[in-house]
Amino acid sequence: MATFIITGNYTVQAIQGMIANPSDRAAAVAPLVEAVGGKLLSYYATTGETDFLMICEAADGEDIIPALMVAGASGTVSNLKTVRAYSSADFMASQKKAAGIAAKFKPAG
């Protein structure tokens, strides 16, 4: 499973709804992620440029996109951004692979 970090913002509509009816947003989002075969690992309310951060697992990016489309179409979130995250072990494997192919590249100039 691939790991994805998703950030976004709540719309005014969402904030009004949360004030009127407080809810556990992780519990609300988890079934959506599960519906595409993924798993919600963590959900955080954040300060700064974004209002929330989620860490999810899914087979690949094509699997997580439908969940993001549904959330975005709800009108309660905006500015959704998704990045694929790699473990330290995965990144080490990439470094070793790069070392093995480095001689194949000829830089410009």
Can you describe what each PLM-predicted range is?
Residues 1-109:
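A compositional/biophysical signature of low hydrophobicity enriched in polar/charged and small residues
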